[in-house]
Swiss-Prot record:
This is DNA topoisomerase 4 subunit A. The lineage of its organism: Bacteria, Pseudomonadati, Pseudomonadota, Gammaproteobacteria, Pasteurellales. Gene3D superfamilies: 3.30.1360.40, DNA gyrase/topoisomerase IV, subunit A, C-terminal (2.120.10.90), Topoisomerase II, domain 5 (3.90.199.10), Topoisomerase, domain 3 (1.10.268.10). The keyword rRNA-binding does not apply. It comes from Haemophilus influenzae (strain ATCC 51907 / DSM 11121 / KW20 / Rd). The gene is parC. The record marks 43, 79, 81 as: Interaction with DNA. It holds the Pfam family DNA_gyraseA_C. InterPro entries: GyrA/parC_rep, Gyrase/topoIV_suA_C, Topo_IIA-like_dom_sf, Topo_IIA_A/C_ab, Topo_IIA_A_a_sf, Topo_IIA_dom_A, TopoIV_A_Gneg, Type_II_DNA_Topoisomerases.
Length: 747
C-alpha cells in the first residue's frame, strides 16, 4: 500500500520498498548487465561497444582511432556507466589470450598473458573492429533486428546484433549477476559451424551426434584439456560442470620445457609457486627454473632437474597437483534465451535455439529485401509509363499547377510512382530508355521470385542458412588450439618421497621417551638416559619410512622419524605426541617398508599376518590393531622373511609347536587364529602363556639355553614338533622349561 501526502512525498512500508528495489535491481543486473543474449552472445556493454565502433566507421579496414573516442561514444550515447569498466570490457575483447576470436583489433599495450590488467590507459591505445566482427554487424540495417531508445531517448540502439554464427559458443563469456552467474567456455568455429549445419540437415539429431563433431571447449591457449569425455558429455548435457586444463611440456637436452599454460594462468605466478617449493626444500630433485619467454615464444618456462635420474613424469605430476600448471574452470552455461528469461542450457538446446534465432533473422532480412524489390518494381512500372508517354508527361509537368495530381489521374499512377517521376531530373527523364528499364525489371523480378520461393519453403530457407554458415566458417576458420587428451590424475609427491632416504635408528626408553639417531651403527643401550630411566626398545629403518609404536592395549601409532628429536638429546615423551588410553604404555617400536609382512600375536596364543602399512595410523589416538583376550599381552612383532617360513611357538609349560606361517590368516587388524592350544582358563589366570615366538626357515637349527644347559635341535630333530596350527605341540626336553633362551642357526 502506498500513498502520497500533501507535500508530494510517496510513502510505503519499508519492507515493500526494499523488496521492490532489490527485485528491480536484480532483474536489471541479470537482464541488462551480466548475462549474454543467446542470439549474439554479447552482454549489453559488449554489444554497445561493438555497435558504437561500427557507427564510428571503425571497421577492420579503417584507420585506428584512440580508444578514448570509442569509450566516450559508448558512455555518451548508449551506456551511462563508469569509463574504466567499459574500457576493461573493450580490452578483454581485444586480448587474443582472453578471447578465442577477438572482436577488437588493438594497437598499443593491451596487456599480456602474465598480467592481463597491465594494459595502457585508453588515451594511449588505439583500436578498430577485427575482421570477425563482421559476423555480428554485416546484416545491420537490413531489417534484421529491432531497435530501442537509448538511455536518454535521443538515439536508437539495436536490442541485439544479427549474428551469422553462434557467437555465444565461439567466444563464450563470464559474468556475475544477482543470485546467479555465467561461465560459458569458448569453442572452435569449425566444430560449432559443422554442428549447426548437421542440425539443419538432421533436426532430430541428439547430443551424441553433436559430440561426434564438437570435441569440447577450445580455449585461446595450446594447453591440453584433460577432462574425460564422459565428464565433457555430462557438462554439455546439463549445462554446468568443470573443465580441467594442463600445461604442455617436453624434454629437451635433459631440461623440461613448458610451452603452454592453462587459460588465465600467469607465467610469473607459476614460476613463483615452483620457486617457493624449491626454497622450502620441497623439490630437491629440481636444480633451477628459468623464464625464457620472448616475442617468438610467449610462454617458455625451463625446469632444470638435478640429474638425469630424476623421474620427470612424477615431477611434473607433482607440479600439476600443486601449482597453476593445472587448473579447473567452472562451466555454467547461463544465458538470456529467446523467451527473454535466464536459464542454464545444454549444448544441444543452445544450438537449436540459436538456429531458431537465425531463421527469424534471415527471414526478416529476406522479407526486408523483398519489400525493397517490390517497391522498386512498382516504381519501375511508373517510370515505364512515363517513358511510353514522355511528351505528355513533360507537358503536364510544364503547364499544370499540380502536376502530381494530374499525373496520378491521367496515367492511374500511385503516390510513390508520381513522386519518383517528379523527382527525376529533366535530363534523366529525357534519357529514359526502355531497354534499361526492362533489364532492371527482369533482374528484380527474378530476385522477387527467388526471395518468395525461399520465404515460402522451410527447406530452401535452411539450405540458405546452411550455405551462409559454411561460407562464414570457412572465411574465419582456424585450427583447434586446445587439444583434448585424457591423462592420469596429477599426484602430489609426499614429503617423505622427496626427502633423501637416510638410515635412522629410533630409540624408546622405559619411561616412554623417544629420539632418533642418524645411521644404524649406534649402541642404543650406551646412550645417556634421564635419571631413573633406561633403554627399552629400538628400531632401524629409513628416514622416509614411518615409525610405528605398539602399546600394551594392542593399539598402533605412527610418526615421521624426522619429527622426532635428535639422539644427541635425551628425547621427548611420547605422551606429548600420542594420545594413549589410560594406563597404557608403549611396548614396541617397528620400522619396515609398507609391504613388509609381519607376524602379530598375543601371549594367549593367537596371531595373524599383516603388512606394515596396516600398522600405520597418522592420528594421535592411533588405531586398534590387536584384539587381546582378557589379561593377555602383546608379543613383539616378527618380520616374515618369505612365504615358506615356519612359526615356532613355545609355551611356559614347555610345549613347542612348529607350523607353516602361511596357515595364519592375513588380516589388517583383529584377534587372529589360534597358533598353539593354551586352555582359556590358563591364559586368563596367566598360569600358561605363549612365551617364545620365532620365525625360521625349514632348514634352520635351534640352540636352546637354560642356565648352563645347551641343546641343539637340527632340522630332522624339529620334525617331531611339526603339526597343524592350533595343536598342543610336543614337550621340550627336560630342563628347558625355565629361563629359556633360543638362538636360530640358519644354513
Amino acid at each position: 500500500m502506498t500513498n502520497i501526502n500533501y507535500e508530494g512525498i510517496e510513502q510505503m512500508p519499508l519492507r515493500t520498498f526494499t523488496e521492490k528495489a532489490y527485485l528491480n535491481y536484480s532483474m536489471y543486473v541479470i537482464m541488462d548487465r551480466a548475462l549474454p543474449f543467446i542470439g549474439d552472445g554479447l552482454k549489453p556493454v559488449q554489444r554497445r561497444i561493438v555497435y558504437a565502433m561500427s557507427e564510428l566507421g571503425l571497421n577492420a579496414t579503417a584507420k585506428y582511432k584512440k580508444s578514448a573516442r570509442t569509450v566516450g561514444d559508448v558512455l555518451g550515447k548508449f551506456h551511462p556507466h563508469g569509463d574504466s569498466a567499459c574500457y576493461e570490457a573493450m580490452v578483454l575483447m581485444a586480448q587474443p589470450f582472453s578471447y578465442r576470436y577477438p572482436l577488437v583489433d588493438g594497437q598499443g599495450n593491451w596487456g599480456a598473458p602474465d598480467d592481463p590488467k597491465s594494459f595502457a590507459a585508453m588515451r594511449y591505445t588505439e583500436s578498430r573492429l577485427s575482421k570477425i566482427s563482421e559476423i555480428l554487424l554485416n546484416e545491420l540495417g537490413q531489417g534484421t533486428v529491432d531497435y530501442q531508445p537509448n538511455f536518454d531517448g535521443t538515439l536508437a540502439e539495436p536490442q541485439y546484433l544479427p549474428a551469422r554464427l553462434p557467437h555465444i559458443l565461439l567466444n563464450g563469456t563470464t559474468g556475475i549477476a544477482v543470485g546467479m552467474a555465467t561461465d560459458i567456455p569458448p569453442h572452435n568455429i569449425n566444430e560449432i559451424a559443422d554442428a549447426a549445419v548437421m542440425l539443419l540437415d538432421n533436426p532430430k539429431a541428439g547430443l551424441d551426434d553433436v559430440l561426434e563433431i564438437v570435441q569440447g571447449p577450445d580455449f585461446p591457449t595450446e594447453a591440453e584439456i584433460i577432462s574425460p569425455k564422459s565428464e565433457i558429455r555430462k557438462i554439455y548435457e546439463q549445462g554446468r560442470g568443470s573443465i580441467k586444463m594442463r600445461a604442455t611440456w617436453k624434454k629437451e637436452d635433459g631440461e623440461i620445457i613448458i610451452s603452454a599454460l592453462p587459460h588465465q594462468s600467469s607465467p610469473s605466478k607459476v614460476i613463483a609457486q615452483i620457486a617457493e617449493q624449491m626454497t622450502a626444500k620441497k623439490l630437491p630433485m629440481l636444480e633451477d627454473i628459468r623464464d625464457e619467454a620472448d616475442h617468438e615464444n610467449p610462454i617458455r618456462i625451463v625446469l632444470v632437474p638435478r640429474s638425469n635420474r630424476v623421474d620427470t613424469d612424477a615431477l611434473m605430476a607433482h607440479l600439476f597437483a600443486t601449482t597453476d600448471l593445472e587448473k579447473s574452470y567452472r562451466v555454467n552455461m547461463n544465458m538470456i534465451g529467446l523467451d527473454h528469461k535466464p536459464a542454464v542450457k545444454g549444448l544441444l538446446e543452445i544450438l537449436n535455439e540459436w538456429l531458431d534465432f537465425r531463421r527469424t533473422t534471415v527471414t526478416r532480412r529476406l522479407q526486408y529485401r523483398l519489400d525493397k524489390v517490390l517497391s522498386r518494381l512498382h516504381i519501375l512500372e511508373g517510370l515505364m509509363i512515363a517513358f511510353l508517354n514522355i511528351d505528355e508527361v513533360i507537358e503536364i509537368i510544364r503547364h499544370e499547377d499540380d502536376p502530381k495530381a494530374e499525373l496520378m489521374a491521367r496515367f492511374n499512377l500511385s503516390d510513390e510512382q508520381a513522386d519518383a517521376i517528379l523527382n527525376l531530373r529533366l535530363r534523366h527523364l529525357a534519357k529514359l530508355e526502355e531497354n534499361q528499364l526492362k533489364a532492371e525489371q527482369d533482374e528484380l523480378e527474378k530476385e522477387r521470385l527467388n526471395l518468395e520461393a525461399i520465404l515460402g519453403s522451410e527447406r530452401r530457407l535452411n539450405t540458405l542458412i546452411k550455405k551462409e554458415i559454411q561460407e562464414d566458417a570457412k572465411k574465419y576458420a582456424n585450427p583447434r588450439m586446445s587439444q583434448l587428451v585424457e591423462r592420469e590424475e596429477a599426484k602430489m609427491i609426499s614429503e617423505s618421497d622427496m626427502t633423501p632416504a637416510e638410515p635412522v635408528t629410533v630409540i624408546l626408553s622405559e619411561m616412554g621417551w623417544v629420539r632418533c639417531a642418524k645411521g644404524h651403527d649406534i649402541d642404543p643401550k650406551s646412550l645417556s638416559y634421564k635419571a631413573g630411566d633406561s633403554y627399552l626398545a629400538h628400531a632401524c629403518g629409513k628416514s622416509n619410512q614411518a615409525v610405528v609404536f605398539i602399546d600394551s592395549t594392542g593399539r598402533s601409532y605412527a610418526l615421521d622419524p624426522l619429527s622426532l628429536p635428535s639422539a644427541r638429546s635425551q628425547g621427548e615423551p611420547l605422551t606429548g605426541k600420542l594420545n594413549l588410553p589410560t594406563g597404557a604404555t608403549i611396548e614396541y617400536v617397528v620400522m619396515a617398508s609398507e609391504q613388509q609382512e609381519l607376524l602379530m600375536a598375543s601371549d594367549a596364543g593367537y596371531g595373524f599376518i599383516c603388512k606394515f602399512e596396516d600398522l600405520i595410523a597418522r592420528n594421535k589416538a592411533g588405531k586398534a590393531l590387536i584384539s587381546l583376550p582378557e589379561n593377555a599381552k602383546v608379543l613383539k612383532p616378527k618380520t616374515l622373511i618369505n612365504s615358506t617360513a615356519l612359526v615356532v611357538a613355545i609355551t611356559s609349560a614347555g610345549r613347542m609347536l612348529i607350523f607353516p606361517a602361511q596357515d595364519l590368516p592375513v588380516l589388517s587388524k583383529g584377534k587372529g587364529n589360534k597358533m598353539i592350544t593354551i586352555p582359556a582358563a590358563n591364559a586368563k589366570d596367566r598360569s600358561e602363556l605363549l612365551t617364545k615366538l620365532l620365525l625360521i626357515s625349514d632348514q634352520a637349527s635351534l640352540e636352546f639355553y637354560s642356565g648352563k644347559r645347551k641343546i641343539v635341535l637340527k632340522p630332522e630333530d624339529l620334525q617331531k614338533f611339526r603339526a597343524e596350527r592350533g595343536r598342543k605341540g610336543s614337550t621340550l626336553p627336560r630342563g628347558l622349561h625355565t629361563n629359556l633362551e633360543i638362538m636360530v642357526i640358519e644354513p
